[in-house]
Design a protein with these regions (language model features):
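Solvent-exposed beta-strand/loop surfaces of large extracellular or lumenal domains
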Residues: 7-10, 59-85
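Beta-propeller blade termini and top-face loops
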Residues: 160-587, 595, 602, 606-619, ...
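Edge strands and adjacent loops of beta-rich recognition modules
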Residues: 2-4, 13-17, 842
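Intrinsic-disorder/low-complexity, polar/charged segments enriched in Ser/Thr/Lys/Arg/Asp/Glu/Gln
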Residues: 19-25, 44-46, 82-84, 97-99, ...
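Long, ordered, helix-rich scaffold segments
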Residues: 538, 552-560, 565-976
Length: 976
């Protein structure tokens, strides 16, 4: 006989000894049970038991999921640790009540469920089975069948955003796995290509990064500790798998030992096979990238950037690692700081993903408690090992994992979204943070940016190109040189793309998929141009690749492969040991066909910094006319030989990237000498290459006010850049940087009416500048707005300014305006209706109410007027809005009307909205629910509508429940 019990705390008499069964039923979201739908949802369902001393076995619709302990005759209790069991695809019945049954054995009756009740989790949602269950003693199993009709008790169907803390399961779910040979045989290659496995498990596990030292040896980073940091306890998390932990980890050797490691592999006899395999550092935690340089190895070991000294190069650290940086976030361990790589300028560059934040400090330099450099979300950072300067290089991007400098020093990354093959980063660039959801990705770091620079458009591209590189190796096909190659772990292939110039950046066009593998566990996550001219591919080798699945312990930490890809007809380079070469031998390598040789030569020359080499490099740069000159410039800079005289001369160099890098390298000093500044200003006036002009703008952002604004003024007069994807935004960022403390200097530029007439200013600057001043909202800012209006030469320019002014005031009441601005506003020929409303014009208010109710008018105009009328508290607005919400069909207008109605407190409004709820368009119902939840009196009508069935429970989100609970009293009691 089944009887009711409460889980986790059973009622009296329901703690029997011996064997028995608990059961309940659950109806899951349809996509959890839809085979042939999106695999991620079906494959990401797990069941968790927090703690139970009893031996137990878990069954779903009669199918065993797992268990702990053992039953008589050899009975053993569970270890009381939390358990997670995978729900296999097909185990859940769509649209039915699935039977969850747990067989238990309690020797003494003390083994009831502890902590919380069992729970079932999908990728983003979960359901907690705390409450009523059924219990039956004995060993006879329940029917093991899903029900069509909801059972009378112990039935659960309320799911909410997943937030229960996660942990690493004792048993991991690996999924299908082929041997290295079997997987290799499944590759499909474009004609003329060859691929081979150079390393595989157990020598390689979970590889996320590949690098090479000056001897051409391969360094591999094994991110085996992922996804859980060693020794830390998760105390909370959100549905995006961002977690908080109980403490900040210390750097090695004071950390909790983990499973990640760094290894080095060498091909001694030159036959292409790695003969020696050494572990350089092990027992690491969140170590995802290792990079040789400066007589040691740099390891990105979040939250620290570590340096392991190894001056004698014996592959044994000389001592404990030095923490050069601290404070990188690890809330989401698939978004941590990563991808460290040497820039051509001698800086160490790294990336940060989309769902972590950082507050970076420099141990030993910054005082205890220093604020550090804070940033939330994706960005590119850099650090100089000699000066120990740290800065954010570019803001935004995708969930960046890996960085790539091409042959001209451009910086790229992949993207874990669609529509692009990646991002092209320029200095001081500001890009979209992965997506526009501030709840997931954080708000814009600069609220006055009013825009961002785009990713490289590529048409209809499915997500995603996790990692991209610019192919540049002599053993690769000639047609591939300089093209982007993307690693797509979701689709088990590599994609080759052509870059098409688009002003200062690019669009991309896919050429094809030259490398495919039908093995579902092939997951390419990183690629590198190798010293021998081939290409190496790091394969994470996982059946399950989504990070949420990894947090669910669907991961294989024992697998991993590395492949070599090359053209069949191309020989590999044998001379890959540059360590013993003299400076005289390294300089000619600056024109080597392999990027690795060129960049390694630059790095070695820079680290040696021999004074005698400086003159030779100056001569090299002057003598060369192409890319070899650029590499010479980088080397000259790194040895300390790029002075103003040399840089000024290079502004005339025929290769545009030499000109751009001369500006950038001197600009890194954050102030230019008077002579060099004047030379750059003249360059800005005449420069014909958009990437050089883009770099001038990027450098200007870093410079003092007069130099910055002087360069921006020249660039704003270059009509050719009006449609450029980068330069207009860069110019705006130069101006915006000085609006706060040097407003007068910015406005002085616009005392010249000819600047208004420049297409760059007309299209990209005027509206933003007016909006920036008005949004800041101080009296001096409004006086600045008046000056802009006064100096504007035409009505069209004033219209541009007023568009920015109106945007700045959206969502707020009009503040007191200075007389100077009021005078200019009165002089406007035909001020916009929305502005007249905000100024309190009674005739305009009446006209606005008519427009608001006119369905034939553009929805955008009506929404603006609703907001403006609400902000000024227009008379008659309540009645107009009430009529609107009862008749309107446009979702945007209706949602704006409901939001504006919240300022009025009449109970009749709640009655009207609740009564009309069924007639609202589905897309507007969240706004209606938010309206009803906003006031206690209306909340009672919301709860009554739910109780009567007129409003579906699923329409009330967890966030809304939290609002209801905040009202307290009877509303809170009913909500709970």
């Amino acid at each position: 006989m089944w009887r009711p019990v409460a889980v986790p705390g059973e009622v009296e008499g329901a703690r029997p000894a011996g064997t028995g069964w608990y059961r309940c039923w659950v109806k899951v979201p349809d996509n959890w049970a839809t085979l042939g739908g999106r695999d991620l949802w079906v494959e990401s369902v797990t069941l968790t038991i927090d703690s139970s001393h009893a031996a137990h076995a878990v069954f779903l619709n009669g199918k065993r999921l797992g268990g702990a302990g053992s039953f008589p005759p050899d009975a053993k209790p569970s270890d009381r640790l939390a358990k997670r069991y995978k729900v296999p695809p097909g185990a859940l019945a769509k649209g039915r009540w699935n039977e969850l049954a747990i067989k238990v054995f309690n020797r003494d009756g003390s083994g009831r469920f502890r902590g919380s009740g069992p729970s079932i989790q999908g990728y983003f949602l979960e359901c907690l089975f705390s409450g009523e269950w059924e219990y039956q003693p004995g060993t006879a199993p329940p029917p093991g069948q899903a029900l069509e009709v909801k059972p009378a008790r112990a039935a659960y169907d309320q799911f909410h955003e997943a937030s229960r803390v996660l942990f690493e399961a004792q048993t991991l779910v690996h999924g299908e796995r082929l041997s290295p040979g079997e997987s290799l045989a499944r590759f499909e290659l474009e004609d003329g290509l060859a691929i081979e496995t150079v390393l595989h498990e157990p020598l390689v596990t979970q590889p996320t990064y590949l690098s090479f030292d000056a001897r051409g040896r391969l360094w591999v980073s094994h991110y085996v500790q992922y996804p859980y940091p060693a020794g830390l306890r998760q105390i909370s998390r959100d549905k995006y798998y961002r977690a908080k932990y109980d403490r900040q980890p210390k750097p090695p050797p004071h950390h909790t030992p983990g499973r990640s490691r760094v290894t080095v592999h060498e091909d001694i006899d030159g036959d292409g096979s790695y003969d020696t395999h050494k572990v350089f550092a092990d027992k690491l935690s969140l170590a995802n990238a290792a990079l040789p340089g400066h007589d040691g190895i740099w390891v990105m070991h979040t939250p620290h950037l570590l340096f392991y000294p190894d001056r004698n190069a014996d592959d044994i650290p000389d001592g404990d690692p030095v923490a050069h940086l601290a404070g990188f976030g690890f809330e989401d361990t698939h978004s941590v700081a990563n991808g460290i790589t040497w820039g051509p300028d001698g800086w160490l560059y790294g990336a940060q993903g989309s769902t972590v934040s950082c507050r970076v400090t420099r141990p030993g330099i910054d005082p205890p408690g220093a604020a550090g450099v804070h940033f939330e979300g994706c960005m590119v950072w850099r650090y100089h090992p000699r000066s120990r300067e740290f800065e954010i290089f570019a803001e935004g991007g995708g969930n960046v994992f890996g960085l790539e400098f091409d042959a001209d020093g451009r910086l790229f990354s992949g993207h874990n979204g669609g529509g692009t093959r990646g991002f092209h980063y320029v200095q001081s660039g500001l890009y979209l943070k992965q997506g526009k959801s501030p709840g997931k990705f954080g708000p814009p770091d600069n609220p006055f940016a009013f825009g961002e620079m785009p990713m490289m458009p590529g048409g209809s591209i499915p997500r995603f190109s996790h990692n991209v590189i610019a192919v540049n190796g002599s053993a690769m096909p000639g047609a591939w040189q300089g093209r982007l190659l993307g690693a797509d772990p979701l689709h088990h292939h590599l994609v080759l793309s052509k870059r098409v110039v688009r002003g200062a950046s690019f669009t991309t066009r896919d050429i094809g998929f030259p490398v495919k593998n039908s093995d579902v566990a092939f997951r390419p996550v990183y690629m590198a141009n190798a010293p021998d001219g081939s290409l190496l591919i790091a394969d994470f080798y996982e059946r399950y690749i989504a990070h949420g699945q990894h947090y669910q312990s669907q991961i294989d930490p024992t697998s991993g492969r590395i492949y070599r890809l090359q053209a069949k007809a191309k020989p590999r380079v044998a001379d890959t040991d540059l360590r013993a070469k003299t400076d005289e031998q390294l300089i000619p390598l600056l024109s080597h066909p392999n990027k690795w040789h060129r960049q390694t030569a630059v790095r070695l020359l820079g680290q040696r910094a021999n004074e005698a080499t400086t003159d030779k490099l100056r001569k090299w740069v002057k003598a060369e006319t192409g890319r070899a000159a650029l590499h010479g410039l980088w080397a000259l800079h790194q040895v300390g030989g790029l002075d103003d005289a040399s840089a000024t001369g290079l502004l005339e160099h025929p290769y545009p990237h030499v000109r751009a890098w001369a500006v950038r390298l001197r600009g890194d000093e954050r102030e230019l000498s008077a002579g060099f500044f004047n030379a750059v200003r003249r360059l800005a006036q005449r420069e014909g290459h958009p990437e050089v002009r883009s770099q001038i703008a990027g450098t200007a952002i870093r410079l003092p006010r007069d130099q910055a604004l002087g360069l921006a003024a020249e660039l704003l007069r270059r009509d050719a850049d009006v449609d450029d994807p980068f330069i207009p935004m860069q110019c705006w960022l130069v101006l915006e940087r000085h609006c706060e403390n040097d407003r007068a200097a910015v406005l002085e530029l616009f005392s010249d009416a000819t600047l208004y007439r420049q297409p760059m200013a007309e299209r990209h600057i005027l509206e933003r500048l007016m909006r920036r001043l008005a949004a800041r909202g101080r009296q001096d800012d409004f006086i600045g707005c008046a000056a802009l209006l006064k100096n504007a030469p035409t009505q069209g320019h004033r219209d541009k300014l007023m568009a920015g002014f109106s945007k700045a005031l959206e969502g707020q009441a009009l503040p007191r305006l200075p007389d100077e601005l009021l005078e200019q506003l009165r002089r406007l020929d035909n001020p916009p209706l929305v502005l007249r409303v905000r100024l309190g014009d009674s005739a305009a208010l009446g006209q606005a109410l008519q427009v608001i109710g006119d369905a034939a008018r553009p929805a955008k105009d009506r929404v603006e007027l609703i907001r403006a009328a609400s902000d000024v508290g227009a008379a008659g607005l309540q009645q107009a809005l009430l009529r609107l919400v009862q008749r309107e069909t446009d979702t945007g207008v209706l949602s704006a009307g409901l939001l504006a109605l919240q300022r009025f407190g009449d109970d009749s409004l709640g009655k009207a909205v609740a009564g009309h709820y069924a007639n609202f368009p589905e897309a507007a119902r969240p706004a209606a629910v938010s309206f009803l939840a906003s006031r206690p009196a209306w909340s009672r009508r919301l709860l009554a509508a739910v109780e009567s069935g007129r409003l579906a429970k699923r329409d009330v989100t967890l966030a809304t429940v939290e609002v209801l609970l905040g009202h307290g009293g009877e509303v809170a009691r009913q909500s709970s």
